């Protein structure tokens, strides 16, 4: 009986985590460039069998017999598939047609700055001429420097990321990509940051001016999953 209660308990924890992720996806369905998150699940006894290992064999798990100890969250993942493009015709709205990220200088509450990466190209120019995100973070060029533009000039963004002011090239967007997206983690609402082991590479994408990339969230699919998860949670709750 105790094992049955524990199985239901771990099931509730698992479904609660899935529900949190789905809720966050739905909350960001209209967030520009947002990427869907998901979770995987695995049997708790499989994890335990891997952890309890015979020291004579560092790879093979020790045989511990039949168990039924419920389920646990495996790992979180991000779906980096592209969202659809929305026409805005705004000068500083940009979208990337393939894999790649805009480079942004983010400053936290402690005043520490670091480079983050985003697919959200809804930019603007300040009175001082700085190209910034909608949150006021500085957009960086291909050398990692802040981009300054003449607010009164006619600005055109080339497909390769080159920025033209009144027909003359003045800067180039810092568009970066990574060899393995498993080394990227979500940061805040719409940024990504590399973790140890991440390797940068040249981005092979085009820049489209006057467009924004929508999120890749399928609202109907997320709602169906939410109903399924809620029912599974209630079932485990009734067992307890």
Model-inferred region functions:
Residues 1-240:
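Amphipathic alpha-helical polymerization modules
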């Amino acid at each position: 009986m105790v094992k049955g209660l524990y199985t239901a308990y771990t099931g509730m924890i698992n479904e609660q985590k899935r529900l949190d992720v789905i809720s966050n996806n739905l909350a960001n369905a209209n967030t520009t460039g947002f990427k869907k998150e998901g979770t995987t699940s695995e049997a708790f006894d499989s994890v335990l069998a891997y952890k309890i290992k015979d020291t004579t064999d560092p790879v093979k798990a020790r045989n511990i017999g039949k168990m039924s100890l419920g389920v646990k969250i495996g790992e979180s993942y991000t779906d980096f598939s592209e969202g659809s493009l929305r026409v805005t015709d705004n000068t500083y709205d940009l979208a990337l047609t393939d894999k790649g990220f805009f480079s942004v200088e983010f400053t936290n509450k402690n005043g520490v700055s670091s480079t983050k990466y985003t697919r959200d190209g809804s930019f603007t120019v300040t009175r001082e001429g700085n190209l910034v995100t909608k949150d006021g973070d500085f957009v960086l060029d291909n050398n990692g420097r802040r981009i300054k533009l003449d607010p009164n000039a006619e600005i055109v963004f080339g497909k390769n990321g080159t920025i033209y002011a009144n027909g003359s090239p003045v800067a180039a967007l810092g568009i970066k990509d990574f060899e393995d997206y498993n080394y990227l983690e979500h940061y805040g609402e719409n940024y990504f940051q590399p973790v140890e082991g991440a390797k940068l590479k040249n981005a092979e994408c085009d820049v489209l001016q006057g467009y924004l990339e929508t999120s890749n969230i399928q609202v109907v699919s997320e709602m169906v999953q939410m109903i399924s998860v809620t029912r599974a949670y209630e079932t485990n709750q009734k067992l307890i």
